[in-house]
C-alpha cells in the first residue's frame, strides 16, 4: 500500500458520508419542508448548510486522525495490516494534518457565524468545544471504562440536533401556525440524534471488545480490560437490545400511522433483523471474529437508519431528486 492509498483509507469515507447524511436527510426532507409549509423562512441557505456540513465532517475527520495517531501502538497489535501512522505515513505528519484540519474548521466556524448574523454566535463556541472534547477523548478518555464511549456517542448524537440552533426562531414562529407539523419535524431531528447516540454507543462498546488484546497489552483501561470481555458483553448486549426495542417500536408506530409498506418492510429487514442478529451475536461471541461480525451489522443499521428513520420520506422517488435539486440550487 503506497502513501496515497494509505491516506485515502485514513479518511474513512463511508463514516464521513454517514455524518453528512445524518445532517442532510432530516434537515432537507423534514425540518426545512415543515418550516416552508408553515409559511416560514428557513435561516439556512444551501451555502450556509454546506459550510456547517463541511465543518462537521472535517471535525469528525480531525478526530479520526488524532485517534489513529494515539492508537498506533494498539493498532499494531489489533490490526497491523491497517495501521497507517508509523507504517505507511510518518507519525509526526498526523499532528500536522490534525492541526491543519482544526484551523480549517475554525475558519469555517467564523464564516458560518458571519453568514448567520445576527445570531447568538453558536458556531464560535460549538466547533472549538467539540474539537477540544475529541482531543480529550483521543488523548485520555478513549482508554476509560465508560466515559469515553458516552462522550464520543453524545457528540455523534449532536450532529443532527446541531441544525436546530440556527433554525430556532423560524421553528418558534411557525409552531404557532402549524404546530403539529413543525413539532413532528423537530421530534424527528431529535429521533435522529437519539438513534445516532445509541448506535454509536453500541459500536464503541463492541469495538472495545473487538480491540481487547491490543488494549490490554497497551494498558488501555476499557471495561473489557478492567472487568473482562465476558462482563463487558452485558452492557453491549443491553444497548443492542435497547436499539432493537426502539426499532421495533418505530415499526409499530409506522404501521399505525400509515407509513408506506415498503418502508415498514425495509425497516424490518434492514434495521430490526440486523439489530436482533447483532444482539444475539454479542451475547454468543467468543473470539474477535464474532465481534467483527456484530460490528458489520451495526454499521448496516447506522447507514440504513439514516434513510429509513425519515417517516416523511416521499412516496414518489422523484421527489428525492427534487429535494437534491433544491439543495444544489440554494448553494
Where are these regions (language model features)?
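Alpha-helical membrane-inserting segments
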Residues: 25, 29, 33, 66, ...
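C-terminal membrane-associated helical module and adjoining short loops/tails
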Residues: 1-18, 114, 139, 157-160, ...
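Multi-pass membrane catalytic core of lipid/isoprenoid biosynthesis enzymes
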Residues: 53-54, 72-127, 219-257
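C-terminal ends of transmembrane helices
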Residues: 68, 73, 132-147, 208, ...
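Membrane-embedded alpha-helical segments that form the functional core of polytopic membrane enzymes
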Residues: 20-70, 105-106, 121-135, 180-205
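Alpha-helical transmembrane segments of integral membrane proteins
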Residues: 14, 18, 22, 43, ...
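Intramembrane alpha-helical segments
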Residues: 5-9, 82-176
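Peri-membrane helix termini and adjoining interfacial loops of integral membrane proteins
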Residues: 34-35, 72-79, 168-175
Amino acid at each position: 500500500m503506497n502513501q496515497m492509498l494509505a491516506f485515502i483509507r485514513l479518511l474513512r469515507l463511508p463514516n464521513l458520508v454517514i455524518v453528512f447524511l445524518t445532517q442532510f436527510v432530516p434537515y432537507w426532507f423534514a425540518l426545512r419542508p415543515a418550516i416552508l409549509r408553515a409559511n416560514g423562512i428557513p435561516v439556512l441557505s444551501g451555502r450556509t448548510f454546506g459550510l456547517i456540513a463541511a465543518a462537521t465532517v472535517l471535525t469528525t475527520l480531525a478526530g479520526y486522525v488524532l485517534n489513529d495517531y494515539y492508537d498506533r501502538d494498539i493498532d499494531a497489535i489489533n490490526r497491523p495490516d491497517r495501521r497507517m501512522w508509523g507504517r505507511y505515513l510518518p507519525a509526526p505528519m498526523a499532528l500536522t494534518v490534525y492541526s491543519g484540519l482544526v484551523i480549517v474548521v475554525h475558519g469555517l466556524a467564523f464564516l458560518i457565524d458571519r453568514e448567520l448574523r445576527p445570531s447568538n454566535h453558536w458556531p464560535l463556541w460549538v466547533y472549538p468545544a467539540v474539537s477540544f472534547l475529541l482531543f480529550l477523548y483521543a488523548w485520555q478518555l478513549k482508554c476509560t471504562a465508560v466515559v469515553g464511549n458516552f462522550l464520543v456517542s453524545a457528540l455523534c448524537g449532536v450532529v443532527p440536533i446541531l441544525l436546530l440552533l440556527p433554525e430556532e426562531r423560524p421553528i418558534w414562529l411557525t409552531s404557532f401556525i402549524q404546530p403539529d407539523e413543525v413539532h413532528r419535524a423537530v421530534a424527528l431531528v431529535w429521533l435522529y440524534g437519539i438513534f445516532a447516540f445509541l448506535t454509536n454507543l453500541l459500536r464503541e462498546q463492541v469495538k472495545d471488545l473487538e480491540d481487547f488484546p491490543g488494549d490490554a497489552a497497551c494498558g488501555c483501561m476499557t471495561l473489557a480490560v478492567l472487568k473482562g470481555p465476558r462482563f463487558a458483553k452485558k452492557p453491549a448486549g443491553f444497548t443492542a437490545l435497547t436499539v432493537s426495542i426502539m426499532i421495533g417500536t418505530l415499526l409499530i408506530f409506522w404501521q399505525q400511522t400509515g407509513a408506506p409498506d415498503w418502508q415498514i418492510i425495509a425497516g424490518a429487514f434492514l434495521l430490526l433483523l440486523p439489530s436482533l442478529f447483532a444482539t444475539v451475536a454479542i451475547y454468543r461471541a467468543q473470539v474477535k471474529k464474532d465481534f467483527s461480525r456484530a460490528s458489520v451489522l451495526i454499521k448496516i443499521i447506522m447507514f440504513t437508519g439514516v434513510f429509513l428513520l425519515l417517516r416523511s420520506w416521499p412516496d414518489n422517488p422523484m421527489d428525492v431528486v427534487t429535494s437534491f435539486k433544491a439543495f444544489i440550487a440554494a448553494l
